[in-house]
Amino acid sequence: MALTTLNIKEPGLNVLPPGVERYVVEGGGLTGIQILPDDEIEIINNEGNQICEVSVFNKDGKSELAILSLKEIRDNSEIKKILLKKDETSLQALLQLKKRKLNIEKSKSSVIFDKETKAGESIKLKSKDKCYCIFAAPGNQMMVHEQNPSTELTIMVTRAEIKREKEFTIIPD
């Protein structure tokens, strides 16, 4: 029997294969993701010209970029700037990092992409160990006469091991 559009349960819904997760880093914001050993991470620069700053913490909460084979470039000034804003989402993110006992003050970061990056360009990374990663899409407020908004990044995580545990079946709040 041929598949037809009648078989589509939710039109427009992008269905990912098992073990693949999609995260969006909003322009000017950040996203934290728990990464496990041998997970593959693809960072996609959707619209181009967007810098991506990455900070990685090992299972002990210490900054360790080598887990993703990244080199230290700066002491994560852009991530710190985003976290030190006094808006509600920044305060929530800072609280979550403190709950995880991650020392953001002493953390280092690496910069992926630059202002010359083409739209759709991506980079793939592979985790060597369990870690918590913070991905940021930093940028200044848009100047009307320059048309320079920060844009979103897409993070695709392909899990090395697909878990069917109860904690992964519950939708978070």
Residue spans of the language-model regions?
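Acidic, Ser/Thr/Pro
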Residues: 1-173
